[in-house]
Each structure stands twice: as C-alpha cells, then as structure tokens.
Design a protein with these regions (language model features):
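Glycine-rich cofactor/substrate-binding loops
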Residues: 2-31, 74-79, 297-417
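Acidic-glycine-rich active-site phosphate/pyrophosphate-binding loop
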Residues: 9-11, 150, 228-244, 283-286, ...
Length: 417
C-alpha cells in the first residue's frame, strides 16, 4: 500500500523530493544520531562522561551503521524508534571496550530525541517554505507592476461590483504573502529550540555533579542547564526556557502557520479557477501541452494546478486542527496525543511545500487576458460605475435616495445623463 504522498505516480504532485528526504526514516534517524553525538560531546566537555566514551559514541553515530531492519523490528516491539537506535550505538561502542557504550544517552529520554529531531526536520522544511514564499513574493511584485493599470471588474458575491485593476488584485495577495513571511520569521525563535530535560523535564539525573568528575556549577549555572546549552549549540538550536514535553503550542503554531499560508494560495487558486471559466476568460494557468487535458473533451484546458492547490490546502487545514488537538496532553508525558503529531505533521509539511511549488508555478507563468477583462467590464454598459454615480448624486439628492434610484433600475438612465 502507498499513500498519495509517497506514491510513485502522485508523489511529486502532493509532495516534493526535498520534503520526502527530510521526513524519511533515514533523515529522522540521522537527527537522532546527531543528538546523541552532540550530547556526548557536550557531556565530555563538562566531565560528565569520559572523553574516550564520547569519542567512540560520536564515531558510531553514523546513519550508515544503523541496521534499519532491526530498527523496524524493535520499533514494532517497543513502540518507539529511539531505544532501538540507542541500543545499536551502545552495542557498537561496547565492542571497543566493555561498558564504554553505556555512557550513551546519558540523562536523556526518548522524547528529548524525538522532539529535537522533529524541530530539526521543521527547520529544514521551513527553510524550503521560506524560499518558496520569497519566489512567490517576487513573482507577485512583477504582476503588480505589469498590470497596475489593467482595468477589470471586482466581484462581490460573484457579481460585478466596481472597477479595479488586476495589479490591485495581485497587490492584496502580495500583502498577504509578505505577512506570512513576517509570521515565519517571528515563529522561528519560538520553534527552533532544543528539547533536552530528562524523564520529567527536570534534568534530575545531572542536576547534581556529586557522582561525576565535574563541578556542581559551570559558568555560574547548574551542570544540567550548562549541558543543555552546549547541546543546543552543537545542534544550532535555541535553549528552551523550560521543558516542553507536553506543552506543544510551538509545534501546533507551525502547523497552523502552514494552514494560513496554504489557505492564501487556495484563495488565489479559487479566484483563478473562476477567471478561467469559459464564460469569463480573464486569466489562465501557464500553458503546457496536455496539462489539464480532458480524456473526452479535447477543447478543454482544466485548471489542474488550482485544483491541486485547493485540495492540498484544505487537507492541511484539517490536519492542522489535529495538531491543535495534540496540545491537550496528559501530565508530563502524553498517552496518545503525541502520536497524533507523528501521523499528521509529515503530511502537513509535504502537502504545504507541494502547494507552494504549484502556487509559485502559477504566479510565474500566469496568462492574463487584458482584452477579456475589458470585455467583461463593459458587459453592464456602465452599471459597474453605479456606485460612483450614486455618490455624485448623493451630494445633491441624498445618498440613500440616489441608492434607491439605482436599486430600482434607474441607474442605467442616470449613467446616460
């Protein structure tokens, strides 16, 4: 069985190769290993574990050394992939010297590794998202400039409203994507933080240095907090203000940010679908031979990119609500809500990046029919400017009376005066 995201046929439509690599078993495991290597380095610097142990732990924290078949079997048995990875590291280091590998994973817990790996995966994902936002903004700026004086009819409740320019329509979208860029930059320092705090979030196993060849405090800070800082530095992450094992608001914020972002893409795609209708004919998706073709109606040019965008964005919004549900976790380690994230977060990221790539493609190659816009603007034979007539007459006969004159069908005559 395959899903639409990892399908050989649909995979590059509903995901991207870059995202598939980030959320793969191999990359997740690599980040587990990066955590263990970074932890060993930090603890050796502080005298918590022997330098020899740290050197060999780091040496064997290579994804190429992991037996993924054994990892799969052990994960099915244990329920989590972290302990099987740690067991493999310990076993390899113990071949160097008996018991030397037992220093691996010192003071850490399963969720420390899992959460930190997710943060690193999100960091990679949002780097790609940021690139897509920048490309979309650049394309929109070009459309705004090119069509700033191209008149068209605005639509209110799907009816012609008043004249606007197509450049103005694009400028509103540009403002939205610029706000999304700001949101992303504001999100990063809250999201890109380490999780390393031990079983219940207190760093209790290394809170006191009495059993280590290390001082109780380093640089005026408790040993556990200093270890946390060094590990964060190794991984290029921020230091958490406090443990967040069952405080999942930052991850939910990331998911809901992607929901907002892709919803803006879907707003544009919805407008484009309507503008591509045969009876409207104001804009079209980029032309590529056979793209959007019908199997039975050769004249059709379907808005296939817009359809993909709307479908993916709707799915992201639905799954983002599941990430909000995962916030409701019990005590200091949840029984169930945590696993929700494992299910939906990779899909949210895959669909979001694919959605943005489709959006970028549409903006960069958008076909605008200026004559079609002008033609539609003239359909009402001047009625589209009735608001301006009403406001002009309002100075003399009153705005409400002028409105009622137009409402009951006399604006056509007034426009001819």
């Amino acid at each position: 069985m395959t899903t639409i995201i990892d399908s050989h046929i649909f995979g590059n439509v509903f995901s991207t190769p870059e995202i598939a690599a980030i959320w793969s078993d191999k990359q997740r495991t690599k980040y587990f290993l990066d955590f263990e290597a970074g932890l060993a380095k930090a603890q050796a610097k502080l005298g918590i574990i022997p330098q020899k142990a740290a050197d060999h732990i780091v040496k064997h924290c290579r994804v190429e050394e992991i037996d993924f078949n054994d990892l799969r079997r052990q994960t099915e048995l244990i329920g989590y992939p972290v302990l099987p990875v740690v067991k493999q590291i310990v076993a390899k280091v113990n071949t160097v010297e008996a018991q030397l590998g037992e220093w691996a994973h010192w003071g850490a817990t399963t969720q420390d590794l899992t959460d930190t790996a997710v943060v690193l995966q999100l960091r990679d994902t949002l780097a790609l998202v940021g690139q897509s936002i920048d490309a979309i903004i650049n394309a929109l700026r070009g459309l705004c400039e090119r069509y700033k004086t191209t008149p068209m009819a605005a639509r209110s409740n799907l009816q012609q409203a008043v004249p606007i320019s197509f450049g103005f329509k694009m400028a509103r979208l540009l403002a939205s994507f610029e706000r999304h860029k700001q949101r992303l930059n504001e999100l990063k320092p809250r999201l890109f933080v380490l999780e390393f705090s031990g079983a219940a979030g207190t760093l209790a196993t290394i809170a006191s240095a009495s059993s280590y060849n290390a001082p109780d405090e380093v640089d005026g800070k408790p040993l556990g907090l200093r270890c946390q800082e060094l590990l964060a530095e190794e991984l290029g992450l921020g230091v958490p203000t406090i443990a967040w094992h069952t405080e999942r608001d930052n991850l939910a914020e990331a998911a809901n940010f992607l929901a907002l972002l892709t919803a803006t893409s879907a707003k544009f795609a919805t407008d484009l679908k309507l503008m591509m209708q045969s009876e409207v004919g104001e804009a079209r998706e980029p032309y590529v031979a056979h793209r959007g073709s019908s199997s039975t109606m050769p004249q059709k040019r379907n808005p296939i990119g817009s359809a993909y965008i709307c479908g993916m964005a709707a799915s992201v919004r639905g799954m983002a609500s599941s990430m909000t549900e995962a916030i409701v976790a019990d005590h200091e380690r949840s029984t169930g809500p945590w696993q929700i994230e494992w299910i939906v977060l990779p899909q949210i990221c895959a669909l979001s990046h694919a959605c943005l790539k489709q959006t970028q493609y549409l903006f960069e190659g958008l076909e605008v029919d200026e004559k079609g816009m002008q033609r539609n603007l003239e359909l009402s034979k001047g009625m589209v400017v009735s608001e301006a007539v009403m406001m002009g007459l309002g100075k003399t006969i009153g705005r409400q009376f002028a409105h009622d004159v137009g409402k009951y069908g006399h604006t056509y005559l007034l426009c001819r005066l």
